[in-house]
Curated annotation (Swiss-Prot):
Originating gene: psbK
Annotated family: Belongs to the PsbK family.
Membrane topology: Single-pass membrane protein
Function recorded in the entry: One of the components of the core complex of photosystem II (PSII). PSII is a light-driven water:plastoquinone oxidoreductase that uses light energy to abstract electrons from H(2)O, generating O(2) and a proton gradient subsequently used for ATP formation. It consists of a core antenna complex that captures photons, and an electron transfer chain that converts photonic excitation into a charge separation.
Name assigned to this protein: Photosystem II reaction center protein K
First-listed, main subcellular location of the protein, grouped into a coarse class: plastid
Transmembrane segments: 40-60
Native organism: Vitis vinifera (Grape)
Signal peptide: none
Subunit structure of this chain's protein: PSII is composed of 1 copy each of membrane proteins PsbA, PsbB, PsbC, PsbD, PsbE, PsbF, PsbH, PsbI, PsbJ, PsbK, PsbL, PsbM, PsbT, PsbX, PsbY, PsbZ, Psb30/Ycf12, at least 3 peripheral proteins of the oxygen-evolving complex and a large number of cofactors. It forms dimeric complexes.
């Protein structure tokens, strides 16, 4: 469990502190998609949390 947590922390740190992550801009033709693109990195975390909710629903069998 500790290894998985460490891997998640490393992935989040590399995503948050990479210089291209915050300063990359979409081409002007796709500017209307900016709000969607801002939310997209969070979507995998929802699946991660869903796994815990699912296991809680089946009593962690």
């Amino acid at each position: 469990m500790l290894n998985i947590f460490s891997l998640i922390c490393i992935c989040l740190n590399s995503a948050l502190y990479s210089s291209n992550f915050f300063f990359a801009k979409l081409p002007e033709a796709y500017a209307f998609l900016n709000p969607i693109v801002d939310v997209m990195p969070v979507i995998p975390l929802f699946f991660f949390l869903l796994a815990f909710v699912w296991q809680a629903a089946v009593s962690f069998r």
